[in-house]
């Protein structure tokens, strides 16, 4: 670590003025030397005219070791406040005293810096380059501010600007050499210097305050409103002009220019002069007050975005397409989801809600190693290592137990041990199927006649019915007479029950006989053959092909069909005319029609008349007085009953106390009866159990006696059978005959 610290160096400015060094014993006389020097420099700069002597009059300081007070910002490198304050001073004042004094002080410090023997780091070299650029930029700004009238009156041409820019590097080179020599002589004081990043004058921008920014925004809004009004007026004129009137088309700009907006403009801080002065406050009185609002969080860097020179109206894929969630699913998720008020808050959220203790971030000057988070992102290794795999294989080998078989003696005898070869079976000989159905099909085909019988036509005499009456034309149906009905216009939707008149009688089904066959052809009945179901291969393809062929064949036959030849009928006999009699229809008789409304009206009038008569009769009956029969005379008169009082009550005039029964006594009696019944039941159960026990004991005794009897061996007596009677045989005795083995006597 010691080597690292020796090689590492950080040129950071100090954020404070070390006034402790001014209180040394040797510097007691020169306490105000720094302030005097600053005043002298300002007087010299004010006394001189032009910008030529601005940087020439560099007076050495009274004491080389004197601590220089350099006003620096809070941030070490990227300090926006210093830039803003410097730019405001350059714009407002012609000659900024603070800038000149700081430059001279830096120049004086850089002269006395000795050459550094250590190797310059990349960071130091970059910082020094920035310092040199900033110095040159400040010089240019001072020149511009010193002569504002000349710059406004006479603007240099492009060629002059280019020539001036070409000369600048030469001056910069000489300035770089001087500063490098001066910086090398004072390594200690270089640490106290402030490095400010420089920007080229072309890219330099004047920062505006928040009020100016708000004014600009309001101006832009007003301009947009004016443009919108103009467009609306044009549209109004176009609408009023109509379709036929020629209207001047407004030229719309294709490219839409958008101003550059930097995030750093919104981070402008107030000038220290404009800030409120420090006020002494009583500490104890401020304890109970509410804390101030949390410190303002610093915004990040400006995010670079592409320039939208022309905006399209087409919506993107993300805007149009969104995952569809049905309403039922949303309702189900809502019921399943626990509300946030029931969740416990984490401690991290509470920490974030608390206000930060330190508003000003502390800058650490010591080098620190970066806190890399990659080691925490390492995932757990899921695959097994070789050592684990070998250990698992070893466990499997140990678990497996090998059991040896007996030695086969044939191995020692010699010769290969081969399994017995199975006997080779002969190949299967195919045998054709002799099906009965094939036989029947062959027999049927042989029975079928190859050619149909030749049919000859023989004419027959003409039937006489044709001459007598019309043949083949059906009789005309006699339609029923139309019955007129009153139209019920007011009762269209009323459904009426069908009346008997409306119900049509079901006509009997006419059984038609089959047509008479042709008498010229002799009738030969065909006896249906006794057939069985034929098993045919099931295939849609063959059936469809066959149907298609039949269809094509039928179409061809219809197309090639010959035109039918005309054949005249024989002439009838004109001697006698046998025409059918002409049927004369009866004339339609006019009948008066009866409307439904008339019938309903008559019925209603009749019912209304009956109701009126009934009401009048009831009113007359109510008006006539009719007395009810007198039943009081026949009833018995009312006789009050005398109250029966006891003798004691009558004498003393007091009531005798009747006997009473307490509910406790009644319950006690009921309880005694219940206990008595329970005792009887218990005694009965005990008696039954005792009887069952005695019966079981008797059964066991009987079983033991039976077993003892069966176990004792007792011989069975000799059985007596019926005597056997021997009868003599009736057959004669066998006569012995010698066998004839010789073949001499055979013929």
UniProtKB/Swiss-Prot annotation:
Changing residue 464 to N: In a colorectal cancer sample; somatic mutation. It is found in: Nucleus; Cytoplasm, Cytoskeleton, Spindle; Cytoplasm, Cytoskeleton, Spindle pole. The modification Phosphothreonine is found at residues 59, 72, 147, 338, 369, 499. It comes from the Eukaryota. Belongs to the TPX2 family. GO terms for cellular component: axon hillock; cytosol; intercellular bridge; microtubule; microtubule cytoskeleton; mitotic spindle; nucleoplasm; nucleus. The gene is TPX2. Keywords: Acetylation, Apoptosis, Cell cycle, Cell division, Cytoplasm, Cytoskeleton, Isopeptide bond, Microtubule, Mitosis, Nucleus, Phosphoprotein, Ubl conjugation. InterPro entries: Aurora-A-bd, TPX2_C, TPX2_central_dom, TPX2_fam. GO terms for biological process: activation of protein kinase activity; apoptotic process; cell division; microtubule nucleation; mitotic cell cycle; mitotic spindle assembly; negative regulation of microtubule depolymerization; regulation of mitotic spindle organization. This is Targeting protein for Xklp2. Residues 167-181 have a biased composition (Basic and acidic residues). The keyword Cell division applies. Pfam families: Aurora-A_bind, TPX2, TPX2_importin. Its main location: nucleus.
């Amino acid at each position: 670590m010691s080597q690292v610290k020796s090689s590492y160096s950080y040129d950071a400015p100090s954020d404070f003025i070390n006034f402790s060094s001014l209180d040394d014993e040797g510097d007691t006389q020169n306490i105000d030397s720094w302030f005097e020097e600053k005043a002298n420099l300002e007087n010299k700069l004010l006394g001189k005219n032009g910008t030529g002597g601005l940087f020439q009059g560099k007076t050495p300081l009274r004491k080389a070791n004197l601590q220089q007070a350099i006003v620096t910002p809070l941030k070490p490198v990227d300090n926006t406040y210093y830039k803003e304050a410097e730019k405001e001073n350059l714009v407002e004042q012609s000659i900024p005293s603070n800038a000149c004094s700081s430059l001279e002080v830096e120049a004086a410090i850089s002269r006395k810096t000795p050459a550094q023997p250590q190797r310059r780091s990349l960071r130091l070299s970059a910082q020094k380059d920035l310092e040199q650029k900033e110095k040159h930029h400040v010089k240019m700004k001072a020149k511009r501010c010193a002569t504002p009238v000349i710059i406004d009156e006479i603007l240099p041409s492009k060629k002059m600007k280019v020539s001036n820019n070409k000369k600048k590097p030469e001056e910069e080179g000489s300035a770089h050499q001087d500063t490098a020599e001066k910086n090398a002589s004072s390594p200690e004081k270089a640490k106290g210097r402030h490095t400010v990043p420089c920007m080229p004058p072309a890219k330099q921008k004047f920062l505006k305050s928040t009020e100016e920014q708000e004014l600009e925004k309001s101006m832009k809004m007003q301009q947009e409103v004016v443009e919108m009004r103009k467009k609306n007026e044009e549209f109004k004129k176009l609408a009023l002009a109509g379709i036929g009137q020629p209207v001047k088309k407004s030229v719309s700009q294709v490219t839409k220019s958008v101003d550059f907006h930097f995030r750093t403009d919104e981070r402008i801080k107030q000038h220290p002069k404009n800030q409120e002065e420090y006020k002494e406050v009583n500490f104890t009185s401020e304890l109970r007050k509410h804390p101030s609002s949390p410190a303002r969080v610093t915004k990040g860097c400006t995010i670079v975005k592409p320039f939208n020179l022309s905006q399209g109206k087409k919506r993107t894929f993300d805007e149009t397409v969104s995952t569809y969630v049905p309403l039922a699913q949303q309702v189900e998720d809502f019921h399943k989801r626990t509300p946030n008020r029931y969740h416990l808050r984490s401690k991290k959220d509470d920490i974030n809600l608390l206000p930060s203790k330190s508003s000003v971030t502390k800058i650490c000057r010591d080098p620190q190693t970066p806190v890399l988070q990659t080691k925490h992102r390492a995932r757990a290794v899921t695959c097994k290592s070789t050592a684990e795999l070998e250990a698992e294989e070893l466990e499997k080998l140990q678990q497996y137990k090998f059991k040896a078989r007996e030695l086969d003696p044939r191995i020692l005898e010699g010769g290969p041990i081969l399994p017995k070869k199975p006997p080779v079976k002969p190949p299967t000989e195919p045998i054709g199927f002799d099906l009965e159905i094939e036989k029947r099909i062959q027999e049927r085909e042989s029975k079928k006649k190859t050619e149909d019988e030749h049919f000859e036509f023989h004419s027959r005499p003409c039937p006489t019915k044709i001459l007598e009456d019309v043949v083949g034309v059906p009789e005309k149906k006699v339609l029923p007479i139309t019955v007129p009905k009153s139209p019920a216009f007011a009762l269209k939707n009323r459904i009426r029950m069908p009346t008997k008149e409306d119900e049509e009688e079901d006509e009997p089904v006419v059984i038609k006989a089959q047509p008479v066959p042709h008498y010229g052809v002799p009738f030969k009945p065909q006896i249906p053959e006794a057939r069985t179901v034929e098993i045919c291969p099931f295939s849609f393809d063959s059936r469809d092909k066959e149907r298609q062929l039949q269809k094509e064949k039928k179409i061809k036959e219809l197309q090639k069909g010959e035109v039918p030849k005309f054949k005249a009928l024989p002439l009838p006999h004109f001697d006698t005319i046998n025409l059918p009699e002409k049927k004369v229809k009866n004339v339609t008789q006019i009948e008066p029609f009866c409307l439904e409304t008339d019938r309903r009206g008559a019925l209603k009038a009749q019912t209304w008349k009956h109701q009126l008569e009934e009401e009048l009769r009831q009113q007359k009956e109510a008006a006539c007085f009719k007395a009810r029969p007198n039943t009081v005379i026949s009833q018995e008169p009312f006789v009050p009953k005398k109250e029966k009082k006891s003798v004691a009550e009558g004498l003393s005039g007091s009531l005798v106390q009747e006997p009473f029964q307490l509910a406790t006594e009644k319950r006690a009696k009921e309880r005694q009866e219940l206990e008595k019944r329970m005792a009887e039941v218990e005694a009965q159960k005990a008696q039954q159990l005792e009887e069952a026990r005695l019966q079981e004991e008797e059964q066991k005794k009987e079983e033991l006696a039976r077993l003892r009897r069966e176990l004792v061996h007792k011989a069975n007596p000799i059985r007596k059978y019926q005597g056997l009677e021997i009868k003599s045989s009736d057959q004669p005795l066998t006569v012995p005959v010698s066998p004839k083995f010789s073949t001499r006597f055979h013929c």
